[in-house]
Amino acid sequence: MDLSNIDSWVFDLDNTLYSPEEEIFSQIDKKMTEFIISKFNVDEEEAFNIQKKYFLEYGTTLSGLMKRKNIDPDEFLEFVHDINLESLKPNNKLTSIIEKLPGDKFVFTNGSKKHAENVIQQLQMNKVFE
């Protein structure tokens, strides 16, 4: 397959550049519940229900919090992405394959820029992406 005419590649970050088995999202999911508990002084069950309701109604918990509760997205993203990334290990084979692709490589995420940078650093892919 000739890929030489492709000048840009966009890769999703979470559960794409690393396996869903790494359980990173479960940490983020828990942090979303914690954020709602702290912001609205509700118990864990109510916070979980709010989180899932907004996810279903608005596509993301954050979108619902912004529209219904006027939550600052940067504050939310900073809080929920303050997680432990130590389980992420470099995948040298994947890194090598991506490096060999012609053109520029970019990472796309609905997370924060800091989260993307932290994940890329933990995966030792800093030099691969723009």
Identify what each model region corresponds to.
Residues 2-11, 16-93, 103, 114:
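N-terminal helical cap/lid subdomain that shapes the substrate entry/recognition surface
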Residues 96-106, 110-130:
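Substrate-recognition/cap helix-loop segment adjacent to the acidic, metal-dependent catalytic center
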